[in-house]
Amino acid sequence: MEDKGDKALLELAYSEMYRSMIAKDTVALGQMLTDNFVLVHMTGMRQSKHDYLRAIADGTLNYYSCDDSVLEISVEGDTARMTGRSRVGAAVFGGGRHIWRLQLKIWLERQDGKWFMTLIKAGTF
């Protein structure tokens, strides 16, 4: 059964994730991710939590804006899944700055009452 409080917390987590990515606040972003977190890029490349945070910090991944977000959220007990669709301003892996129609499928788990991201699969919509 989905709790409206959980949905609000997960919506906030999505917004905070992008705020942290844009600000290059890898400490705040890292606190949202499990130690075994994996990001799967749209190319299929996989990044560990450490590698993902390092790529944000060193400028390999640059995020500038996130607009027009639409979220679908489902919660089952201590696990949740979000699909977020946003227009994201980014320059990644040495490419130019573009607006991406980015879709993130995000898996989360609740630990000690707090939600953590375990897996993100990126694509476009």
Question: What annotation goes with each model-predicted range?
Answer:
Residues 2-31, 38-125:
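A beta-strand edge to alpha-helix "cap/lid" segment located at domain peripheries
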